[in-house]
From Swiss-Prot:
It is found in: Cell membrane; Cell junction, Tight junction; Nucleus; Cytoplasm. The chain crosses the membrane at residues 168-188. This is Immunoglobulin-like domain-containing receptor 1. Residues 189-546 are cytoplasmic. The keyword DNA damage does not apply. Residues 24-162 form the Ig-like V-type domain. One of its GO terms (cellular component) is tricellular tight junction. Disulfide bonds join C45-C145. One of its GO terms (molecular function) is high-density lipoprotein particle receptor activity. Residues 399-546 are annotated as: Disordered.
Length: 546
């Protein structure tokens, strides 16, 4: 039996089909991929074979670039290879670059990672796709997908994929991101000015001026205060300088409204005219306050009754508190004694005593100074006898001779001579009084110098330092203690009786109660103060301020 002859094309087709169906074919989707650091990427790879799938072995190999396609792209050698139609990044032997096995899988088994990729998150999925999680710096290179199928010896068993890792771009992005962050902070800093930024820092958006001007910062703080005081001002009426405890008063907000505390405490409350429609925003509140301050007439004179009460300037006592302190001057007359006609001084001495001396009120501050400064008091005691002797020598020239002769004889100084000086002003006053009555009033406020004996008595008795009365006027007065009277000679008593003033028949002068006790104090305390004032103020010829 003879087989029919087949035409030549059919014979060629039948010969080619078994060979084409039994060959191996590998394909890739992208031949070049770009990725950044720490990103994930999938390299696609597929194949066709006539062998069994469980016998197919898929292997991914890594080969580094011969020349870097990023950094060496603009070099002369790289451009010359491109002009010749070559690939300078991959056209080199394997001994000139690094070659590593990434992963390998047989059939449907689990992939096995290479030695250099054991700690990496790399796997093979689907038929031959390579998955790389967290791309590193050294993953930059060429990846080869190789398929090994038993029985298929023909065809193209591998394909290459270029993986370009933009590590340099990542570094640039990090630097640019930091610069953008700083720029953003600077812009926000300028936009928030002057509320939240620090002064004297120049921003990039406004380098010609300061970031925080002081005027804008003060305006912002003032607006904050006005917003905080706005709701309270809408509810309560405003009082001009009368409500000190209220926060709605305009006194602490404007320095021109500051007055004396004593004056403000007694001013009547005058409610100011308040508009009914208030603007809801903070700028309106500020404008309202400025308008009220402009309408306030500070130059308007006070009423006549207030002028009469507050015409005098503010004293030291009244400035310490809001209460008006009333001061009272109590003038005590001096102690007057007559002097015999044989002891009277000349007309020059008479004119010297008639010279008016400006009076200085003996106020509470001098008493406190004597109490708190004993050194000053001791200096006054040490200086007392010497200054008294000099004044006695000036007033009575004959006394210096008697004093010198008495010292040569060894006899002590008589108290009658020592007391003669204290009688001079009183006798002159007694002689001058009929023709010149005002002399008594002028002499009442003249301060007296303390005598040595009185200074010694006050040095021995420290209690008198707490008194508000001035020191004693002369050497030995009529109110000496009983011990001093016993030690005095009999002639002194007779002389004292002759030198008494006709105005005071008694030995002791009348006592003066010169204490104005503040109401509301304790009665026991008032009694003690009165007794001490009666004891000490009767010894004084000065003015006492209570």
């Amino acid at each position: 039996m003879a087989w029919p002859k087949l035409p030549a094309p059919w014979l060629l087709l039948c010969t080619w089909l078994p060979a084409g169906c039994l060959s191996l074919l590998v394909t890739v989707q992208h031949t070049e991929r770009y990725v950044t650091l720490f990103a994930s990427i999938i390299l696609k790879c597929d194949y066709t074979t006539s062998a069994q799938l469980q016998d197919v072995v898929v292997t991914w190999r890594f080969k580094s670039f011969c020349k870097d396609p990023i950094f060496d792209y603009y070099s002369a050698s790289y451009q010359a290879a491109l002009s010749l139609g070559q690939d300078p990044s991959n056209d080199c032997n394997d001994n000139q670059r690094e070659v590593r096995i990434v992963a390998q899988r047989r059939g449907q088994n689990e992939p096995v990672l290479g030695v250099d990729y054991r700690q990496r998150k790399i796997t093979i999925q689907n038929r031959a796709d390579l998955v790389i999680n967290e791309v590193m710096w050294w993953d930059h290179g060429v990846y080869y997908c190789t398929i090994e199928a038993p029985g298929d010896t023909s065809g193209d068993p591998d394909k290459e994929v270029k993986l370009i890792v933009l590590h340099w771009l990542t570094v640039i992005f990090i630097i640019l991101g930091a610069l953008l962050l700083l720029l953003l902070i600077g812009v926000c800093w300028c936009q928030c000015c002057p509320q939240y930024c620090c002064c004297y820092i120049r921003c990039p958006c406004c380098p010609a001026r300061c970031c925080c001007p002081e005027e804008a910062l003060a305006r912002h703080r003032y607006m904050k205060q006005a917003q905080a005081l706005g709701p309270q001002m809408m509810e309560k009426p405003l009082y001009w300088g009368a409500d000190r405890s209220s926060q709605v008063s305009s006194y602490p907000m404007h320095p021109l409204l500051q007055r004396d505390l004593s004056l403000r405490s007694s001013l009547p409350q005058m409610p100011m005219t308040q508009t009914t429609n208030h603007p809801p925003i903070a700028n309106g509140v500020l404008e309202y306050l400025e308008k009220e301050l402009r309408n306030l007439n500070l130059a308007q004179p006070l009423p006549p009754d207030l002028k009469a009460r507050f015409g005098h300037p503010c004293s030291m006592l009244s400035s310490l508190g809001s209460e008006v302190v009333e001061r009272r001057f109590i003038h005590l007359p001096p102690l007057i004694r007559d002097l015999s006609s044989s002891r009277r001084t000349s007309d020059s001495l008479h004119q010297q005593w008639l010279t008016p001396i400006p009076s200085r009120p003996w106020d509470l501050r001098e008493g406190r100074r004597q109490h708190h400064y004993p050194d000053f008091h001791q200096e006054l005691q040490d200086r007392g006898p010497k200054s008294w002797a000099l004044e006695r020598r000036e007033l009575d020239p004959s006394w210096s001779g008697r004093h010198r002769s008495s010292r040569l004889n060894g006899s002590p100084i008589h108290w009658s001579d020592r007391d003669s000086l204290s009688d001079v002003p009183s006798s002159i006053e007694a002689r001058w009084q009929p023709s010149h009555p005002p002399f008594r009033s002028r002499c009442q406020e003249r301060p007296r110098r303390p005598s040595p004996r009185e200074s010694t008595q006050r040095h021995g008795r420290r209690r008198r330092h707490r008194s508000y009365s001035p020191p004693l006027p002369s050497g030995l007065s009529s109110w000496s203690s009983e011990e001093d009277k016993e030690r005095q000679p009999q002639s002194w008593g007779a002389h004292r009786r002759r030198s008494h003033s006709p105005h005071w028949p008694e030995e002791k002068p009348p006592s003066y109660r010169s204490l104005d006790v503040t109401p509301g104090k304790n009665s026991r305390k008032k009694g003690s103060v009165e007794r001490r004032s009666e004891k000490d103020s009767s010894h004084s010829g000065r003015s006492v301020v209570i």
